């Protein structure tokens, strides 16, 4: 993540309609699919300053690992539960997790399969892995550049890396269908005007609220009519059963 983007991340996560709508979609899937229980262990990979920890309390005890030290407040309320380290084989927490989250993490990595294999190695036998990634390279924009993304995924391309990592996919769902043509238009505009990448801003209150409600309404409808495309992809997976 670009350092300028990182400095704005807290405000974006807490207030921007996109982050708020993504969080609600994630929580909704967890309520459907994850059996919350006292003492359940949750790992948030790429957790930043632990901004999602309070919401995860509904499902268990959250901790995190974050490679970018500048994103972690040394005096923050969750500092004791955050390990500043890369998410690779050197990260050995000494126990397994019931749920591992990788929220918009894999697109930053040169070796996503390696990271997925490590995540699977840290899961309990019946544990779950929940992942979000940006979708479709067709809508690659300056937003991807300032975020230092390596790629965007489709269901098919993600399924390939999941199979390589030994992950059984339980759910794959596109999010933000309405945003796809908007980003496609943004890409066309950028190809003509060549603007410099800029850190996103939180819109005005009315627009921010409208876009949040639009995204939430679309996500609820997607349970009845799956979205064929979207600007994000949400995946839930697990370790394959023995002898599969």
PLM features: residue spans?
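A short His-aromatic
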Residues: 104, 108
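Feature marks short, surface-exposed loop/turn motifs that line or immediately flank catalytic pockets
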Residues: 71, 137-139, 178
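Conserved N-terminal segment of class I S-adenosyl-L-methionine
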Residues: 1-103, 113-116, 200, 205, ...
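Short, glycine-/aromatic-enriched active-site segment of Class I SAM-dependent methyltransferases
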Residues: 10-12, 129-151, 155-163
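A short glycine-rich, Lys/Arg-flanked "PGG" loop and its adjoining helix->strand segment in the class I
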Residues: 113-128
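Conserved S-adenosyl-L-methionine
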Residues: 167-177
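A C-terminal cap/extension of S-adenosyl-L-methionine-dependent methyltransferases
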Residues: 4, 179-244
């Amino acid at each position: 993540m670009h350092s300028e983007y990182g400095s704005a991340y807290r405000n974006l996560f807490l207030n921007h309609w996109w982050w708020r709508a993504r969080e609600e979609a994630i929580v909704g899937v967890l309520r459907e699919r994850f059996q919350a229980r006292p003492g359940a262990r949750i790992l948030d990979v790429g957790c930043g300053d632990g901004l999602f920890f309070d919401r995860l309390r509904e499902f268990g005890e959250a901790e995190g690992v974050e490679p970018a030290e500048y994103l972690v407040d040394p005096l923050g309320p969750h500092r004791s539960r955050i390990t500043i380290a890369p998410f690779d084989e050197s990260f050995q927490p000494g126990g397994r997790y019931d749920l591992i989250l990788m929220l918009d993490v894999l697109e930053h990595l040169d070796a996503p399969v390696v990271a997925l294999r490590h995540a699977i190695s840290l899961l309990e036998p019946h544990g779950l892995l929940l992942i979000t990634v940006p979708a479709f390279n067709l809508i690659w924009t300056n937003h991807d550049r300032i975020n230092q993304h390596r790629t965007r995924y489709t269901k098919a391309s993600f399924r390939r890396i999941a199979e390589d990592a030994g992950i059984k996919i339980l759910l794959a769902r596109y999010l933000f269908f309405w945003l796809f043509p908007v980003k496609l238009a943004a890409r066309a505009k950028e190809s003509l005007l060549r603007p410099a990448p800029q850190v996103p801003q939180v819109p005005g209150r009315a627009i921010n609220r409208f876009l949040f409600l639009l995204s939430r309404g679309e996500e609820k409808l997607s349970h009845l009519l799956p979205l064929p495309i979207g600007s994000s992809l949400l995946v839930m997976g697990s370790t394959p059963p023995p002898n599969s």
